[in-house]
Amino acid sequence: MDARILKEDDESGLPNKQADVTLLHGKPTQADAEAAVRTLLLWAGDDPEREGLLETPKRVAKAYKELFAGYTESPEEVLGTVFEEVGGYNDLVLVKDISFHSHCEHHMVPIIGKAHVAYLPDHKVVGLSKIARVVDIFARRLQTQESITAQIADSIQRILKPRGVAVMIEAEHMCMAMRGIRKQGSTTITTTFTGEMQVNAEEQVRFMTLTRR
């Protein structure tokens, strides 16, 4: 298949178009990334050769590798181990106030917020830390809040196969706080539901109530 053809997202939530671009052009090197930072410094009006900026390209490339580590991680690996001995527990499991940092795909500035994630188990559960790790995987990519909300829910539903999933995200977008309209403290809330959580209004109310406690 021609590498220029853009395919649909794979099951990890990572666009296959990224793989196509890599096949076509080759993955940029560390040196390429550092050179790009130097170009941005020059474009901004500063001198990348001055003492305070000499190591900045290397530091920025290293920081971006950490900030966007979600592109190299898979929710399948995180959610692959489940526990079936749950003592008959089959009610809502909620992990709330999961703090995260992401980056807006439009301006590449921070999105800072917290996620509340719940699911109705179908005779099996995962370790609570795994839910937080799934949030981190999708947060450490260029995102919109709507996308990260849907990706978290879809991955848990698809891999764990619970009876239903609920996700709420509350976040402040620096693209609104630092630039443009410059409204600090404005919060965006997104929610999504799957399975029984999608069709049962009482379960939705229970989820929303528990997140506010």
UniProtKB/Swiss-Prot annotation:
<keyword id="KW-0547">Nucleotide-binding</keyword>
<keyword id="KW-0378">Hydrolase</keyword>
<dbReference type="InterPro" id="IPR020602">
    <property type="entry name" value="GTP_CycHdrlase_I_dom"/>
</dbReference>
<dbReference type="GO" id="GO:0008270">
    <property type="term" value="F:zinc ion binding"/>
</dbReference>
<protein>
    <recommendedName>
        <fullName>GTP cyclohydrolase 1</fullName>
        <ecNumber>3.5.4.16</ecNumber>
    </recommendedName>
</protein>
<comment type="pathway">
    <text>Cofactor biosynthesis; 7,8-dihydroneopterin triphosphate biosynthesis; 7,8-dihydroneopterin triphosphate from GTP: step 1/1.</text>
</comment>
<keyword id="KW-0479">Metal-binding</keyword>
<dbReference type="GO" id="GO:0006729">
    <property type="term" value="P:tetrahydrobiopterin biosynthetic process"/>
</dbReference>
<dbReference type="InterPro" id="IPR001474">
    <property type="entry name" value="GTP_CycHdrlase_I"/>
</dbReference>
<dbReference type="GO" id="GO:0046654">
    <property type="term" value="P:tetrahydrofolate biosynthetic process"/>
</dbReference>
<dbReference type="InterPro" id="IPR018234">
    <property type="entry name" value="GTP_CycHdrlase_I_CS"/>
</dbReference>
<dbReference type="Pfam" id="PF01227">
    <property type="entry name" value="GTP_cyclohydroI"/>
</dbReference>
<feature type="binding site">
    <location>
        <position position="104"/>
    </location>
    <ligand>
        <name>Zn(2+)</name>
    </ligand>
</feature>
<comment type="subunit">
    <text>Toroid-shaped homodecamer, composed of two pentamers of five dimers.</text>
</comment>
<dbReference type="InterPro" id="IPR043134">
    <property type="entry name" value="GTP-CH-I_N"/>
</dbReference>
<feature type="binding site">
    <location>
        <position position="107"/>
    </location>
    <ligand>
        <name>Zn(2+)</name>
    </ligand>
</feature>
<feature type="binding site">
    <location>
        <position position="175"/>
    </location>
    <ligand>
        <name>Zn(2+)</name>
    </ligand>
</feature>
<keyword id="KW-0342">GTP-binding</keyword>
<dbReference type="InterPro" id="IPR043133">
    <property type="entry name" value="GTP-CH-I_C/QueF"/>
</dbReference>
<dbReference type="GO" id="GO:0005525">
    <property type="term" value="F:GTP binding"/>
</dbReference>
<keyword id="KW-0554">One-carbon metabolism</keyword>
<comment type="similarity">
    <text>Belongs to the GTP cyclohydrolase I family.</text>
</comment>
<keyword id="KW-0862">Zinc</keyword>
<dbReference type="GO" id="GO:0006730">
    <property type="term" value="P:one-carbon metabolic process"/>
</dbReference>
<dbReference type="GO" id="GO:0005737">
    <property type="term" value="C:cytoplasm"/>
</dbReference>
<dbReference type="GO" id="GO:0003934">
    <property type="term" value="F:GTP cyclohydrolase I activity"/>
</dbReference>
